[in-house]
Amino acid sequence: VVEGVERLPDLRKEEAVALGQPRRAPGLDVIRKLQNHKVDTRYIRQVPDGMGTWLAVFDNEGDVVASISKRPNLMPILDILEKNGDEIFSQADSIVIEVDMDKAIVKKTLALAKKYGKSVFGVVANMSIGLERRDFLKELSAFVCNSQEAGLLFCTDFSGLTPEELADVISEKVIQARIPKLVVTVGSQGAVYADMDGDKGVCPARAVEVKDTTGAGDSFCAGLAVGLTYGKSLREACEIGTHLAASVIVTTENVCPRFLPRELGLDIDVAD
């Protein structure tokens, strides 16, 4: 998600992240990429077992049908928040967090965001753990998950529903659960969205040739977070997300290419 955000030039970016061991190439490569795009990496800590692993199984349509993961040790992030949280949050525009992180990290993040009046956007890697954080969803500005994860969240089978039908059901669930905004991605059908005020709808996916769906969800989340941060409506933010997701699945790269803000409908000029 961070890499997706940094592909939009001239947006101020500050991140507090714990990434893997210093000798592990993937973690170091991510840091180098962020630094190359002038992302502030001062708060990154390289620690043993700081980078987990994830194995995913995809079907012929490019959708994840099974996965297994080894969670990293994320507790160093809590230490970062305790020491530097005020400095980070006071300068941030908004926050993106995985809600299935350690409960103490989520609580500290939400407390700091409330203190400085910052929006917090939530994503999830393991919904089985995310369910244990369900109460926190009411404190998020928006939460993003896929239809399978939404089924776990609401203990409901959403398979067989059209996007329009799913939007109606999700709207009802969101109001009942008092979740401010919820976006549910539905693969090749795009995404559905709903908020507590009754706004709901479907944002179709862009018609493109699929090569590899890896990273599409992260890019969608990046686009959604950027859109909402810069004052776009929920539908408009979803459209930015689908734009970035489409740019990922047409290549073998797992991160979207660089876009100028105005290409995505953001009223921000970039200096030549």
Which ranges hold each PLM region?
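Hydrophobic/aromatic residues located in beta-strands of well-ordered beta-sheets
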Residues: 13-15, 120, 182
